[in-house]
Amino acid sequence: MDDDIQAVVIDNGSGMCKAGFAGDDAPRAVFPSIVGMPKHLGIMVGMNQKDAYIGDEAQAKRGVLTLRYPIEHGIVTNWDDMEKIWSHTFYNELRVAPEEHPVLLTEAPLNPKANRERMTQIMFETFNVPAMYVNIQAVLSLYASGRTTGCVLDSGDGVSHTVPIYEGYALPHAIVRLDLAGRDLTDYMMKILTERGYSFTTTAEREIVRDIKEKLTYVAMDFDEEMEKSTRSSALDKTYELPDGNVIVIGNERFRTPEVLFNPSMIGRECSGVHECAFQTIMKCDVDIRRDLYSNVVLSGGSTMFPGIGERMTKEVIKLAPTAMKVKIITPPERKYSVWIGGSILASLATFQHMWISKTEYDESGPSIVHRKCF
């Protein structure tokens, strides 16, 4: 690899795609992982209509489009759409020729083998990249926090995972996947705001609710106490101005929304809360490394951005952990993008340069090379 050619780092999430260049401290492009297809062909007279819109443009024109999310629960389910997103990333967002840059991609923990192969194949055959590599998202988040051992709780828009990592390697047998993340919280908030008499139903309105969620919600230290406080006074109420100028009042929805992460039964799910997932993950690991994991629980992803989540998580994990165990929850301020940042760090390390899968290796071995080189 030439030293002067920057690698491209792409973190494809269920909700947002983060892309940029290795060595940078933040992604240059962050856009929704959405592909929009026109509902009715030729409806906009005089508009030179495209056959597909990606990301923010799809979002802006969502009224006349059918929106699709090619990544569901962290796993790619529609490869044609995924290819469109990658193409948009290279040519429109980063404005680079993919055949000139090595590409580091991220994948969800427990990503099916066939998916990694498909990813590899598209990169080499469709985009002709000179080299590529695939890494697990949670591992990159841990690197970004300056650690090689820890338990990562990564919660994004489509899926959450707790992943134990020891000396840089994820321990797959102990990974816990939780199909509960930002999108479910937005849905729940839409529901409870509707119960309050505000109507949020369309995909456009869902984006408004997502914005309310990101700006005004927080995690209560003690849910019942907070509920009581909110019934007694309106001190917790906040106002939010809708795009049409109307102002709505948000009350206990502010902390009821993220509470779902700790108590999924609120939305009728029988799964464990995020604190129990972290505990289960640690308990599935060798007894000798548990102490290291308990003292290095790193939060990452957009759905860990709620104020108060670190304190609440500490309180809940201490309740589950053995007495006298030191529990430390780390909430890096840049955790919304820590997967991408970890990728940027990794791809710019001198020691990483021999790890890339080169085009030559791919041509010799085919897509299955990814299992031998990326683990």
Swiss-Prot record:
Gene3D superfamilies: 3.30.420.40, Actin, Chain A, domain 4
First-tier enzyme category under EC: hydrolase
Enzyme Commission number(s) from the entry: 3.6.4.-
PANTHER family: ACTIN
Underlying gene: ACTB
InterPro entries assigned to the protein according to its UniProt record, in alphabetical order: Actin, Actin/actin-like_CS, Actin_CS, ATPase_NBD
Localization, UniProt: Cytoplasm, Cytoskeleton
Descriptive protein name: Actin-2
